[in-house]
Structures are given as C-alpha cells and as structure tokens.
C-alpha cells in the first residue's frame, strides 16, 4: 500500500463510524423523532461539520465548509439542528474510532504506554451553567470552566479515553480510576503526576494484572510517611503498608507498632469519617477496598538537580510496580520523562486544533465540541503517524520533521477534498 493512501483509510474509517452512528440516531437525540424528516442538511453532514469546526464564528465556519454541507445553511438552523443531538453521539464516535485503530506502537515492544493528566477549558459565561466556579471573596467574579481528564497514548499520540467534569466538582483521582477500569488493551504502563498518588490509586492498579504504573510522589512532609523519611540519597526498594479504615485499630496501634514491619495509615472511608485521626499522608477521600488491606509498592528515589540549584527540587521519587531488574533507576527516570508528551498534546489540542474556541455557552454544546476536538485530534495524529517524509539528501533514511501546526490546518482545510479525490 502506498504511504500517500494511508490517510484516506483513517478518514474512511471515521466516515463509516459516523454512518453507523447515524443508522441508530434515535439513541443519540434529545427526541426520538428528531431527524426523521428530510432536512436541508442531513445528520451525518451535521456531525462532520461539528468535528471539522475550528476558531471562526459559526457563520464563517459554515461558509468554509459549504462544499461539505452541499448547501448554504443559516447559523440559526445549524444551532437548532445541533441542539437535537446529545454529546453521547460524539463520545460513541470517539470510542469506536479508538477501538478500530490498527498497527499501534508498543513501548519496548511489549506495553501500551499511557499518561493521565487533566487540563482546564474556559467557556463563555452562562449563569445557568453547572460549570460555574465561585469564590468566597466577593471581589472575584465567578466564571465557567470544565476540566478534561485524559488518558493519552504516548507512543501513538492519541487520546484513548477521557472524563469531562465541571471544574467545581473536579476529582482527578476518581476520573483516573474510571478510565483505567475501562481500559482493555493487554499489558500497559501508565504515568501519573504526584497529584494522583494515593493508597486507593495504588491498590486499584495493583489488583489489575495488566496495569504497570509509575506515579510521582511528593518528597516533603506531605508525602507518605515512609517516603518522607527516606534519606537524601538514591533508593530503590519495596515498601509494605497496611491501610485501614478502622479508627479503633488505628488509634490503639499507631504509637507502638514497629513501623518498619507494619505501617498503619488511616484513610477516609465513604462510611467512616474519622477526620480527627486522619493521617496527613492519606488525603484521599476514597477507599474502595476492605477494612484492612495490605498495600505493596516499589519506591525509586534519584537526584534530578544539584544541591546548589536555586528554587529547584533536588530529588524525585517515583512509586511503581515495575520490576527493578527490567527498569533500574536510570531507566525509570527516562520513562517518567515521557509523561511530558501529554502536556504537549494539551497545547496542540487547545491551540492547533482550536479546542479552546467554543461556539456556544451551553454546557451540552461545550461537551459536544470537546469530544469533537478529541476526534479530530486523533484522526490528524493518526495521519501524521503514518506519513513518511524521507529527507532527499539523507543517506541514513532520516525523515523530515512534520510541522504539526500546519498538519492540523491542512487537514481541517482540505479534509473532505482529500477524502473525495483519493489523494
């Protein structure tokens, strides 16, 4: 197969998934009778329009995509038609697209490699929104914001899963557990920053036989007690802890148990609010396991900056269940650095794919457009991954570095022309 024909496959796949969703459109509409009559623009073209929209006003976006819609459509008619759809249809397309992607790269030829992180998206002020963020200080104005929790494939540069939450109800750990519980891809490694570390998160990963995790830990007094007590030197070892939700057991034993053999940590159980005795090292409000639970994990500590580096941390600590023989300290450091790929992806999603530009202040429309941008991002990055641009003067088969900003612009501008012409 010629490399230039590969992008057509992903576009054809997207179109087939859209057509499949449209075939059962009643499951994704606000009313069962929606789109039952002939309209100026059919629902499949409406969905394509929403996915292909960028940062211009609705009128300009409709004009740019007039060849796609096949007719001139007023902005008001477009909004009315859009209001008949549920965001669920874009979630369905997003999931189906990911399920059907082939030839995915593996880290070390063995693992899918993911990162979990979140990013905020501002929406236009809407006093009726559920996404309003308020302040106790009356001098600060409230605003509307949603938080995108994402599971990102670092090797294939695609968003595998997401959870969209109101900023005022954001729970990144809960979202991470939810996304990992849905993941069925064989063995994988997931990288998370220090805000995700908790005993509940560690244990959820431990009980999943396919899950290998690397979670950055805090290093100061707010870290897990055993980690905060580590000396300032390289360390690579196993820690065993007991986690309990029993206030009685904790208070009776915390002062005299041999801390090197048995470590007791109190967490807030949904049915047991022991805030008075809650360990400062266990600030997770969730515990999804039994009253007494043994938690085991590997701790890796290594230097990242010299002692004289101003205003920089000297040491980094990672919590993991990866084998020390296969992943020694130096390799753990290199592996965790790959997490920055998700930070770069958020920048491209927001600015290259215009993900920060919403065309409505309604909550449902904002969620709909976020899913649409994730779909467009995955399609374009899949095309970039398959593109082959050899350097004409290279003798080592090196390739040109593809300009991703231009790739997003070109695909959005000419997407359906490419699909129709077969270029």
Question: Where are each of the predicted segments found?
Answer:
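Single, function-defining residue in the core of a domain
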Residues: 1-56, 64-65, 69-72, 77-85, ...
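Short Lys/Arg-enriched helix C-cap and helix-to-coil transition segments
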Residues: 89-100, 104
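Conserved beta-strand elements of the Class I
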Residues: 112-114
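Extracytosolic and intramembrane catalytic regions of membrane-associated proteins
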Residues: 134
């Amino acid at each position: 197969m010629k490399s230039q024909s590969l992008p057509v496959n992903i576009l054809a796949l997207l179109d087939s998934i859209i057509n499949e969703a449209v075939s059962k459109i009643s499951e994704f509409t606000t009313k069962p009778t929606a789109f039952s009559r002939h309209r100026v623009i059919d629902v499949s073209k409406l969905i394509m329009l929403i996915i292909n929209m960028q940062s211009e006003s609705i009128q300009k976006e409709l004009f740019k995509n007039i060849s796609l819609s096949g007719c001139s459509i007023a902005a008001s008619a477009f909004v009315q038609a859009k209001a008949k759809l549920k965001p669920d249809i874009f979630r369905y397309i997003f999931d189906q697209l990911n399920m059907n992607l082939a030839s995915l790269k593996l880290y070390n030829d063995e693992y899918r490699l993911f990162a979990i992180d979140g990013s905020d998206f501002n929406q236009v002020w809407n006093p009726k929104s559920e996404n309003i963020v308020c302040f106790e200080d009356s001098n600060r104005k409230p605003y509307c914001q949603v938080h995108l929790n994402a599971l990102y494939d670092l090797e294939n540069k695609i968003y595998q899963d997401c959870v969209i939450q109101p900023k005022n109800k954001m729970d990144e750990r809960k979202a991470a557990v939810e996304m990992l519980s849905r993941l069925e891809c064989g063995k994988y490694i997931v990288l998370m920053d220090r805000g995700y570390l908790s005993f509940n998160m560690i244990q959820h990963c431990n009980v999943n036989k396919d899950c290998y995790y690397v979670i950055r830990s805090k290093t100061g007094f707010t870290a897990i007690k055993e980690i905060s007590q580590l000396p300032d030197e390289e360390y690579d070892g196993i820690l065993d802890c007991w986690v309990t939700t029993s206030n009685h057991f904790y208070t009776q034993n915390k002062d005299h148990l041999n801390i090197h053999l048995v470590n007791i940590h109190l967490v807030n159980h949904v049915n047991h609010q022991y805030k008075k005795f809650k360990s400062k090292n266990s600030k997770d409000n969730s515990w999804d396991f039994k009253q007494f639970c043994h938690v085991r994990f590997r701790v890796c500590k290594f230097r990242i900056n010299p002692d004289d580096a101003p205003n920089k941390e000297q040491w980094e600590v990672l919590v993991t269940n990866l084998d020390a023989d296969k992943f020694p300290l130096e390799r753990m450091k290199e592996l965790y650095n790959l997490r920055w790929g998700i930070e770069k992806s958020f920048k491209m999603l927001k600015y290259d794919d215009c993900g920060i530009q919403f065309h409505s202040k309604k909550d449902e429309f904002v969620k709909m457009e976020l899913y649409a941008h994730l779909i467009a991002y995955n399609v374009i990055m899949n095309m970039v991954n398959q593109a082959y641009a050899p350097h004409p003067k290279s003798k080592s088969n090196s390739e040109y570095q593809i300009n991703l900003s231009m790739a997003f612009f070109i695909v959005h501008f000419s997407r359906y022309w490419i699909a129709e012409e077969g270029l």
